[in-house]
Amino acid sequence: MTQTTPVRRPAATRTIVLAAVADLVLVLVFVLIGRSSHSEGFSLGGSLVTFWPFAVGLVVGWLATRAWRYPVRVVLPGIPIWLFTVVVGMFLRVLSGQGVEVSFVIVALIVLGVFLLGWRLIAGAVAKRTDKRAAKSSASRA
């Protein structure tokens, strides 16, 4: 009995959409947590002003890595997406006159790293477990 390595296929449209939405929602959660921790409260305008630079950074990361091909992978595209989100986001904050303190950059790196890489790690673990169960199930039927 020979065991073959599963062929890597580009992601399905549903997976791409869910991954993009997950990334955007997690960046928004980062923004809302940050604003509330500074007693800025929720205002749509203020939240959008804080959110847009990171959203643009996220989009740049997706485009630069062609993340739609394998959006759930951690190393590529996950790590570059995370770094583009932070670096481009901070650069755009500077250009738009928003504050960029060193402590904020550190917090953004940590929190967005946990958020943008964390869900990918979890999804990858779940997918591996599902693949193993499916392989075991098909092997037992054969």
Regions found by a protein language model. Name each.
Residues 1-13:
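Short, Lys/Arg-rich, polar N-terminal cytosolic tail immediately upstream
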Residues 26-37, 60-68, 88-92, 96, ...:
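Alpha-helical membrane-inserting segments
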Residues 44-56:
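Structural signature of hydrophobic alpha-helical transmembrane segments
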Residues 53, 80-92, 111:
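Small-residue-rich segments of transmembrane alpha-helices in multi-pass membrane proteins
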Residues 66-84, 102-109:
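Internal alpha-helical transmembrane segments of multi-pass membrane proteins
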Residues 91-107:
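Membrane-helix boundary connector in multi-pass membrane proteins
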